[in-house]
């Protein structure tokens, strides 16, 4: 018996339906672009050529395959990750011919090409770079001499690499009475490590350990070419310090043969010119007039080549930029303190800032200028280097970031990169997208939600990582070692993936419109290196923010109380970093802004971090700070408190109780407000949202289906906002567009349903693996307290912070951090270190105790060293609830018998499988755990100005219209679904299985079939079934919906010989009202699975090629010569991800399949 359920939807109800008709007879430019996205909106991909294995036929097939599914651009990389070398060396005539052929083919097909500027993926280097033009580092040697006599002495030459060394200076100074060297000099001088947002250390240094500047003698002119110093030494003990520079020795990587060499000096335009002439110009010469047309872009990937801290002429550049000579401060680069601890630290701040400025100007900006001179755009990933990310990113025509698939997705770079684009006035924010671990086991449904979240961070262009060039046609083919999601023509779902590409293109067209809307502008500070900040608390309150660096701060102006940029950005408030340090010229700019009416918040600074204009700079900082903060012109208040108390309406406010796992972004054009809203959960949900828009008709633009609908229920408010209830499906995203004045007479303001809802069903083939209740470490972190404590010996700890302490990589693809709280005697201390750095603690004769140790990727909101709390196993409790029919389970302390768990963030963590797919959910206390199947929802829609209620269940709808009149209507009955159970005829490709036509008595996974050809099959098979539909069921007020149940992984639906849609994510439902007919109907469902099953099956067969570990040792003759294989294997994987004992993946049409009937009732 169905149970009677009140379906309360609060004040409002909306539905986004596949059943409505398209909206308006007059198609606007926005609608036209949504319906048929332009090339600019389409996805792009990296295109990796592997170890010189390239073929013309493969090039043509690759590019044609890209075009066929809607990829607009290939971005060429050349790498070597251990695959056997092919015949084509990088930059050889053969390679240049193949690049030229690629460009000709791209032109013919209508694609664009970009090329990475160097072999490998970082950064700019090659065998034509001599040591003179390579990255340079400061080296030194020192001797101690006794004075009161003349000396003629050979000074030891400092460390020399690659037989190249040049002197910088020779300095002498009295030997300090106390030996105390600068802590962490390798990152303070950028001689080995990188630390971001580094400010002067204020610890007091004893005067006996400090060199006085006036006592430093410059002996450079006394050193001859042979390294012999002649000098009359004053009385006392003197240190003679010889400083010079030598190459770091860093090379570009991972480069194939012909392309591997020294990394170029990135602070020298002369060196960059040499690099261009040897590495870029030959390509341009070969391509000719294809450059600037088909080949229109050159890329510098993320910076991964370490530090450098000198270039020829650095001293002159420093004096020009900083206004003082660095010569007397050079001993700091050898670890000595000059003048005082603080002055030394401030010089080092200037030193790092200068390195960042020179890299931005002489490498990135100069490279951009060379690109422009040759008709190319410049793309850049501006991070991970010894520079200011905001400054470097501003040099790019297309600024790029990255995000990974698999595991928990951290979005470190999208926010600051999108901010750079916004400040540059660009609507294109590129992203190296879905970087991850290969294995041919990912597909569009798994990627979608991560991509949706990336868009909400500001990305507007996906550039897939990666399409690996396939010189041969044996699948799954070449791979980028174990890296990357496999986007290429040999993947099982490549053709079917066009529906995913269409979704991307429609979405990115919308996201590229107008300008980003943000209320807060966050100043990232003046330090270099500088990675910017993440402030998720701003978005959690319903606002958005951009970041701005010191390079753009001077561009700001105030208009009508808003902080404005020259490209049209407008912000309500400028937020300063929490710091005691700021340069006076920056404070002068803040003064100008607040005098013009800007709102500025932040902590009051005390000093300048620089030695420029020392010490008058400090007096000026104090004067300005006292004035600005003393007069209340700048408020010392947190951004959260400011937003809560400033009477600034939230731009996007969820008024429902459950606000988590919803992300948004807002774009604004002259005519429209465009909100993108994404549900990250694998369950449908209803939320009520208040938008900071008024007197405009909301519309729902659904990029998956390409439909545009008007909601039936919404309301304007007097405060200038509009409330709109949204029904979001599992992992669904929609655009809410406000563009026309509201004049819909059929609008409703409230609705309530009481429905006879059928009993809930559990998720298909649900198996609970484990359920725990308590407070967990954030995703991406691992508690390693016990393992670190075991390393303490004799009250000493000497370890390297690495994932060797973990059973796995807790955050693949991200730079991780080690944090520890420990005790020495009575003192409790904390320490942190980046991955691969060393931690050395010596407690002497006191006891050293490790209290907490955590390793992984910390979220911005995770402060200090989080505690690992004990959790409760509630696996059996959850199983009991399911067995008793409770599928929506309250998450509270009753799960552990009413006891109170330790910790302040109580959550249930549950791992389960449904149809063989493993999922892990984290559900916080107070929210229900939903383990029921998703099912059709009732909807209220507007069709051609008529309000209609569409419901799959009988019941009553009560509603109120604009005039306040309350009415009701009833649907007394809804026809039962047509169940398509029983036998199905299934056809497999005849060339891949021994028995290609089979009959399934019931739907099952191919992996459960005894026939090994089917059990291990990977590819596409067709399901066939006929069913009857009565004339009565096709009456005008019935809607029919095909529900495939579970599918692994993509289904193409053909009904009565007509393709009606490709379903690539759950729920696998499709409106077929206009496709069925009275009487017999013929249904065909083409289902595509993934490669792992066939790869597992092939591992049971003899190898017909050589392996070295998981890699291919040599390319077999049968593949090179296209001859018959000597074994029954059908696959050729370049990397072994799967073994013969691995569990097979669920595959095929799993069902249950049915035709749902929904009744349409006009109001």
UniProtKB/Swiss-Prot annotation:
What InterPro entries does this protein map onto? Answer: Beta-mannosidase-like_N2, Galactose-bd-like_sf
The record's Gene Ontology cellular component field reads: periplasmic space
Q: Where in the cell is it found?
A: Periplasm
- Tell me the leader sequence span: 1-20
Quote the function comment for this protein.
Glycoside hydrolase involved in ulvan degradation. Ulvan is the main polysaccharide component of the Ulvales (green seaweed) cell wall. It is composed of disaccharide building blocks comprising 3-sulfated rhamnose (Rha3S) linked to D-glucuronic acid (GlcA), L-iduronic acid (IduA), or D-xylose (Xyl).
Do you know which PANTHER family this protein is assigned to? GLYCOSYL HYDROLASE, HYDROLASE, FAMILY 43, PUTATIVE (AFU_ORTHOLOGUE AFUA_3G01660)-RELATED
Q: Which family does it belong to?
A: Belongs to the glycosyl hydrolase 2 family.
Q: This chain belongs to which protein, by name? A: Putative beta-glucuronidase
The species this protein belongs to is Formosa agariphila (strain DSM 15362 / KCTC 12365 / LMG 23005 / KMM 3901 / M-2Alg 35-1)
Highest lineage ranks of the organism?
Bacteria, Pseudomonadati, Bacteroidota, Flavobacteriia, Flavobacteriales
């Amino acid at each position: 018996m169905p149970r009677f359920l009140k379906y309360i939807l609060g004040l409002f109800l909306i539905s986004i339906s596949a059943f409505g008709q398209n909206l308006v007879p007059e198609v606007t430019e926005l609608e036209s672009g949504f319906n048929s996205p332009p090339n600019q909106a389409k996805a792009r991909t990296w295109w990796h050529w592997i170890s010189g294995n390239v073929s013309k036929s493969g090039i043509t097939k690759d590019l044609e395959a890209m075009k066929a599914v809607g990829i607009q651009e290939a971005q060429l990389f050349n790498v070597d990750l251990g695959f056997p070398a092919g015949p084509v060396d990088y930059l050889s005539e053969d390679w240049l011919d193949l690049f030229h052929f690629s460009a000709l083919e791209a032109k013919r097909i209508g694609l664009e090409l970009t090329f990475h500027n160097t072999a490998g993926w970082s950064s700019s280097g090659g065998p034509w770079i001599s040591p003179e033009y390579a990255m340079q580092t400061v080296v030194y040697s020192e001797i101690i001499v006794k004075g009161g006599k003349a000396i003629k002495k050979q000074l030891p030459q400092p460390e020399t690499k690659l037989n190249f060394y040049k002197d910088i200076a020779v300095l002498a100074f009295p030997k300090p009475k106390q030996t105390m060297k600068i802590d962490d000099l390798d990152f303070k001088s950028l001689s080995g490590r990188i630390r971001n947002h580094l400010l002067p250390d204020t610890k007091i240094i004893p005067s006996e350990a400090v060199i006085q500047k006036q006592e430093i003698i410059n002996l450079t002119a006394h050193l001859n070419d042979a390294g012999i110093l002649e000098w009359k030494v004053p009385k006392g003990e003197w240190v003679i310090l010889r400083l010079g520079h030598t190459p770091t020795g860093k090379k570009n990587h991972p480069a194939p043969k012909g392309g591997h060499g020294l990394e170029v000096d990135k602070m020298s335009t002369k060196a960059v010119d040499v690099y261009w002439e040897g590495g870029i110009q030959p390509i341009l010469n070969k391509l000719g007039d294809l450059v600037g047309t088909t080949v229109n872009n050159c890329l510098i990937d993320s910076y991964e080549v370490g530090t450098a801290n000198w270039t020829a002429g650095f001293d002159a550049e420093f004096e020009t930029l900083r206004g003082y000579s660095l010569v007397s401060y050079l001993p700091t680069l050898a670890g000595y303190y000059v003048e005082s601890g603080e002055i030394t630290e401030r010089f080092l701040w200037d030193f790092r800032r200068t390195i960042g400025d020179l890299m931005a100007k002489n490498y990135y900006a100069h490279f951009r200028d060379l690109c422009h001179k040759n008709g190319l755009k410049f793309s850049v990933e501006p991070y991970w280097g010894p520079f200011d990310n905001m400054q470097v990113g501003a040099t790019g025509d297309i600024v790029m970031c990255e995000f990974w698939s698999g595991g928990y997705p951290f979005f470190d770079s999208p926010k600051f990169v999108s901010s750079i684009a916004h400040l540059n006035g660009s609507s294109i924010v590129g992203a190296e997208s879905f970087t991850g671990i290969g294995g041919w086991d990912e597909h569009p449904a798994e990627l979608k939600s991560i991509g949706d979240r990336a868009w909400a961070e500001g990305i507007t262009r996906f550039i897939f990582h990666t399409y690996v060039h396939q010189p041969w046609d044996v699948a799954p083919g070449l791979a980028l070692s174990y890296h990357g999601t496999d986007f290429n023509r040999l993947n099982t779902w490549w053709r079917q993936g066009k529906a995913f590409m269409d979704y991307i293109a429609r979405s990115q067209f919308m996201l590229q419109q107008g300008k980003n809307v943000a209320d807060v502008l966050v100043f990232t500070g003046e330090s270099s290196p500088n990675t910017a900040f993440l402030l998720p608390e701003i978005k959690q309150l319903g606002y958005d923010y951009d970041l701005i660096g010191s390079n753009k701060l001077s561009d700001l102006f105030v208009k009508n109380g808003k902080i404005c940029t020259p490209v049209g950005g407008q912000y309500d408030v400028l937020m300063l970093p929490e710091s005691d340090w700021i340069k006076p010229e920056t404070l002068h700019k803040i003064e100008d802004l607040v005098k013009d009416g800007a709102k500025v918040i932040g902590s009051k600074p005390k000093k300048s971090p620089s030695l420029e204009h020392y010490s008058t700079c400090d007096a000026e900082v104090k004067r300005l700070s006292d004035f600005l903060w003393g007069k209340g012109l700048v408020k010392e208040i947190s951004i959260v408190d400011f937003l809560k108390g400033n009477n600034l309406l939230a731009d996007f406010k969820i008024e429902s109780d459950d606000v988590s796992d919803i992300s948004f972004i807002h774009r604004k054009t002259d005519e429209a407000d465009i909100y993108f809203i994404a549900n990250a959960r694998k369950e449908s949900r209803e939320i009520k949202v208040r938008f900071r828009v008024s007197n405009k008709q909301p519309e729902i633009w659904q990029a998956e289906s390409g439909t545009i609908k008007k909601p039936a229920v919404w309301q304007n408010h007097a405060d200038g906002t509009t409330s709109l209830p949204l029904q979001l499906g599992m992992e669904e995203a929609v655009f809410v567009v406000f563009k026309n004045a509201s004049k819909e007479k059929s609008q409703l303001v409230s609705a309530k349903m009481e429905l006879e809802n059928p009993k809930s069903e559990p998720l298909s083939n649900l198996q609970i693996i484990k359920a725990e209740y308590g407070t967990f470490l954030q995703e991406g972190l691992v508690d390693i307290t016990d393992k670190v404590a075991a390393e303490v010996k004799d009250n000493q700890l000497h370890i390297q912070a690495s994932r060797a302490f973990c059973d796995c990589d807790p955050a693949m693809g991200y730079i991780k951090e080690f944090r520890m709280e420990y005790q020495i005697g009575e003192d409790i201390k904390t320490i942190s270190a980046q991955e691969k750095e060393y931690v050395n603690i010596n407690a002497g004769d006191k006891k050293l105790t490790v209290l907490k140790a955590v390793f992984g990727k910390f979220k911005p909101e995770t402060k200090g060293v989080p505690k690992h709390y004990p959790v409760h196993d509630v696996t059996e409790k959850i199983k009991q609830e399911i067995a008793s029919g409770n599928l929506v389970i309250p998450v509270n302390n009753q799960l552990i018998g009413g006891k109170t768990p330790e910790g302040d963030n109580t959550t249930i963590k549950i791992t389960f499988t449904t149809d063989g797919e493993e999922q892990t959910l984290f559900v916080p206390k107070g929210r229900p755990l939903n383990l029921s199947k998703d099912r059709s929802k009732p909807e209220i829609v507007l069709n051609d100005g008529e309000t209609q209620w569409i419901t799959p269940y009988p019941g009553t709808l009560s509603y109120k219209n604009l005039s306040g009149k309350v009415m009701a209507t009833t649907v007394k009955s809804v026809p039962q679904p047509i169940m398509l159970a029983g036998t199905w005829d299934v056809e497999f490709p005849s060339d891949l299985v021994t028995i290609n036509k089979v009959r399934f008595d019931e739907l099952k996974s191919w992996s459960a079939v005894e026939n090994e050809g089917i059990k291990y099959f990977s590819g596409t098979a067709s399901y066939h079934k006929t069913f009857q539909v009565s004339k009565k069921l096709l009456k005008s007020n019935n809607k029919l919906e095909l529900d495939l149940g579970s599918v692994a992984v993509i289904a193409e639906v053909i009904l009565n010989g007509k393709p009606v849609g490709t379903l690539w994510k759950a729920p696998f439902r499709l409106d077929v009202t206009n496709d069925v007919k009275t009487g017999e109907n013929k249904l065909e469902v083409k289902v595509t699975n993934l490669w792992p099953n066939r790869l597992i099956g092939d591992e049971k067969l003899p190898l017909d090629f050589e392996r070295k570990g998981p890699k291919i040792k040599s390319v077999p003759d049968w593949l090179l010569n296209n001859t018959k294989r000597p074994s029954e294997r059908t696959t050729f994987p370049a990397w072994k991800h799967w073994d013969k004992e691995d569990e097979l993946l669920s595959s095929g049409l799993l069902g249950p399949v049915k035709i749902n009937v929904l009744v349409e009732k006009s109001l």
